Regions:
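Conserved ABC ATPase "signature" region
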Residues: 37-48, 105-106, 143, 147, ...
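A short, proline-enriched helix->beta-strand linker immediately N-terminal to the Walker B motif
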Residues: 195-199
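ABC ATPase "signature
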Residues: 261-262, 270, 335, 396
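Conserved ABC transporter NBD signature motif
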Residues: 98-106
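The conserved cystathionine-beta-synthase
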Residues: 301-321, 325-329, 342-345, 362-410
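Conserved ABC ATPase signature
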Residues: 176-180, 184
Length: 410
């Protein structure tokens, strides 16, 4: 039995489905802010509007979509409008004009009660400042969202315990915020957000105040949690390395406008203007880009219970010289060349794949950097298999693709 190629990005059933749709969004601060949108003033610059009318443009005609199950990163310098944008999405800051649709709900058209129900039932936010209540222990802080929903104590504690376990705080339930490190306090904030089982998770520079090592650990936790829960996430940051590591797509903002939207490799390798290029000009691409950014579908994947004749036919049909062998759960078993397939008898593909993989590259995780990947890829004639944390095949990296990426980087 042969298998269809596996998409290397995300696990959403409908990866192109727009969960959030933002169109022509404006936020202007000041008296009678709609003046900035008139035909007379639309072409005037931000500085001119501020000096002549006393209006400050926070967001200027912003449009984008966020797909269901996607981690969408909004990145920019201080004052670029990224934090204003994330607050406008749920009208914590009231937009001046534009349209915001979240999973079919018209946010701009919602009345006070509808907006409150939407925020309380479908969205959670995590800020850079943890916002923990000092007189409440970890359990009561993390279960706060469920408590204000009126969830009974036993039920909310059980749900919250699952999230505390997920973020690595098992055993700290009775501790108070003053007894926790910054990283642990932020884990409480993340558990509090996840406990309400939100459809949409808004994270506004949640790791910016943490030490570099703790920050990386928290990024690892978020990646792991997203693999399990597959939430729709809007993540705000000013750090390119963080944006590339976490984001399925990245929007770079400048002066309240979106300068470029693209996948991480597009932002790093193909900036659309000088402003975006400035973010990446001093970056060692191979230290930021990871396997998931360059991996492709394996041209030939066969099941370990396939008959050799069928496996050989699949390899030849794909125009390949080897096949990636997986079991019924798509767990990676090994690599088989055409010669090894010909030598295998019925029921022997798995054993031959395991032996044949001794000379093939070891499987790597999607978040391994190209810097770490290069020596592995160069040491073998075979492509490097990329597997998730359950050992399931996600894609491959061949030397040609890797070389092309590096040459573009240089």
């Amino acid at each position: 039995m042969t298998e269809a190629p596996n998409s290397p990005r995300g696990d959403s059933d409908s990866p192109d489905e727009a969960f959030i749709s933002v169109r022509n969004l404006w936020k202007v601060f000041g008296k009678n802010p709609v003046r900035a949108l008139s035909d007379e003033n639309a072409a005037r610059g931000k500085q001119d509007l501020q000096e002549s009318l006393g209006l400050v443009v926070g967001l200027s005609d912003v449009s984008f979509d966020v797909h269901r199950g996607e981690t969408f990163v909004v990145m920019g310098l201080s004052g670029s409008g990224k934090s204003t944008l994330v607050r406008c999405l749920i009208r914590l800051i009231e937009p001046t004009a534009g349209a915001i649709i979240v999973d079919g709900t018209d946010i701009m058209g919602a009345d006070r009660d509808g907006l409150r129900d939407f925020r309380r039932g479908r969205v959670a936010m995590v800020f850079q400042q943890y916002g923990l209540l000092p007189h409440r222990n970890v359990m009561d802080n993390a279960s706060w969202g469920l408590e204000i929903r009126g969830v009974p104590k036993e039920e909310r504690y059980a749900k919250t315990q699952e999230m505390l376990d997920m973020v690595g705080l098992d055993g700290w339930e009775a501790s108070y915020p003053r007894e926790l490190s910054g990283g642990m306090q932020q884990r409480v904030g993340l558990a509090r957000a996840l406990a309400v089982d939100p459809e949409l998770l808004l994270l506004d520079e949640p790791f910016s105040g943490l030490d570099p090592l703790i920050r990386r650990h928290m990024q690892d936790e978020l990646i792991r949690i997203q693999q399990e829960l597959n939430k729709t996430i809007v993540f705000i940051t000013h750090d390119l390395a963080e944006a590339v590591r976490l984001g399925d797509r990245i929007a770079i903002m400048r002066d309240g406008e979106v300068a470029q939207i693209g996948e991480p490799e597009d932002i790093v390798l193909r900036p659309e203007d000088d402003y975006v290029a400035e973010f990446t000009q001093d970056v060692r691409r191979e230290s930021i880009l990871t396997a998931r950014h360059v991996m492709v579908d394996a041209p030939c994947v066969v099941r370990s219970d396939a008959d050799p004749a069928g496996a050989l036919a699949a390899i030849e049909a794909a125009g390949a010289d080897a096949a990636m062998v997986v079991d019924s759960d798509r767990t990676f078993v090994g690599l088989l060349t055409t010669e090894q397939v010909r030598a295998a008898g019925d029921g022997e593909l798995a054993a031959h794949a395991a032996r044949g993989s001794a000379a093939a590259p070891e499987p790597v995780a999607p978040d391994i950097t190209l810097e770490e990947l290069i020596p592995l890829a160069m040491a073998s004639d075979h492509p490097v298999p990329v597997v998730d944390r359950r050992g399931r095949l996600r894609g491959i990296i061949d030397r040609n693709t890797l070389a092309e990426t590096i040459s573009v980087s240089d």
